[in-house]
Each structure stands twice: as structure tokens, then as C-alpha cells.
Amino acid sequence: GDYLQWAAFGIGFYIVCNWIQGLRIRDQVAFELIFKSKALLLGLIAFPFITFVTYALGAFGPAFYIRNFSMTASEVGILYGLITAFGSMVGVIGGGFLGDKLREKYINGKLYLIMASAFGTAITGLGFLYSSEASVSFTWKFFYHISSTAWLGCAASTVTELVLPRLRAVASAFFILMLSMGGLALGPYLTGMLSDIYTIQFLAEGTNESMAEAIGLKQALAQSLIVLLVPIILLGFACRFLKKDEDNLFA
């Protein structure tokens, strides 16, 4: 399974590299704007680390509640689905609205919101993972979904604002591709692998199987939140270059 995962990822990475090289040959202007804009490049590197966490916690969220709170799949499905849908809706809409308001006052307003979203995702993620009661955990989970989706609109609009109008579809496509390669392809896989490692360790220490699986998954999900430091740091640097890159766009 591991070989197949990395083979598929390697093929995808090779295709992406070929696409970038092809863009450089076919459209030098597009290549320059996308890959030589420091603010845009830092953003494109930073954003997948957020989806690394959200895809991982999304993939193993139901299993976490089943293992740690002894809930049935149907109970988790109803509560988890409703909280995810409503919380994400509030996060996406509210994040976009607030991001536009911040942008009116600060040139880096949208980047500030994305960094706050990453920080809030870490705090609320720890909140729902380490709550002792299911009701408290699901309350944290609701706020987690608000925080973990609030950044999406600001990230997408920042990408399109840093390229010419004719290149917005290409830049958006690469943005989505980076989210998929870094987040969807690696987040659940690496977190699941870490969970298996912890589970084996706990079993070797004499912990019963159900408890070992519950604690192992909880620790793996909690430790995946550490990667949220990366986008906060990278976007902090991006704030230094955003205004200059926007000014150079139509210069």
C-alpha cells in the first residue's frame, strides 16, 4: 500500500513539474507572474499545509468519535454531518465577508485572516480532540469548522488578485492542484500512518486494542496540527511582499 501511495504521488509530482515547464515555454508572462511573485509563491506553498490538517481531521473525524466516545456510526453520521455542513457554511461565508472588510483597511487584510484561521483551526482542533464529553467535543467541532473554512475565499481571491485577468483560471487551477497534492494526497495518509505507529506502541505496552486505537488516533490527529505553524510563518513573510507584487502587476 505504501509503495502504491508514493508511486501515485510521484507520478502526480512529475506531471505537475512537466506542466510548470510547459507553461514556462508556452507563456513566459504567465510563468513569471505565478512563479516569480514572492507573495503568490509563499501563499501557494503555505495553503496546502492547512488542507493537510483539514483533510486529515475530516477523514478520521468519524472514527475518532466512534473510538473515543463509543458512539455508533449512525449517531456520528447525523451529528457530524450537520455540524460540518452548518459550521463550514458559516466559516466560508463569514470568512469571505470579513476578509473583504479587512482588505479595505489593510493591504494584507486577507492574509491576516488566513493566518488567524490557521491559528483558530489549531486551537479548536485541540479543543474537540481533548474534550472529555461528546457534547463539549461537538461544540468545539462546530467552531473548528468555522475556523478551518474561513480562509478559503481569501486564499482563492489572493491568488487571482496577483495575476493578470487572463491568467486567473490558470492560477486558480494551480492553487487547487497544490491543495490536492499537499493536502488530500498526504494529509490522511501520513496521519493514518502515524496513528498506526502509536497504536502498535500502545499494544506493545499492554494496552487493550480498543483503547490503543482510540488513543493512537487522537495523538496522531493532535500532532498533525503542528504543521499549521508553517502557513502562519510563510504568510507572515508574504505580507512583506504583497503590496510590491500588486504594484508590479500592471507596471
What is the predicted role of each segment?
Residues 73-78, 165-175:
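Loop-to-transmembrane helix entry/capping segments in MFS-fold secondary transporters
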Residues 36-44, 134-138, 169:
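Primarily residues marking transmembrane-helix entry/exit sites
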Residues 1-3, 38-95, 148-152, 156, ...:
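Extracytoplasmic gate region of multi-pass secondary transporters
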Residues 122-131, 217-251:
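Multi-pass alpha-helical transporter architecture, strongest
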Residues 1, 16-44, 68:
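Juxtamembrane intracellular "pre-TM" segments in multi-pass secondary transporters
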Residues 103-105, 159-168:
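Paired intracellular helix-loop junctions of major facilitator superfamily
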Residues 1-6, 72, 107-112, 196-228:
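A membrane-interface helix-boundary motif in multi-pass transporters
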Residues 107-158:
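C-terminal transmembrane helical hairpin of 12-TM major facilitator-type secondary transporters
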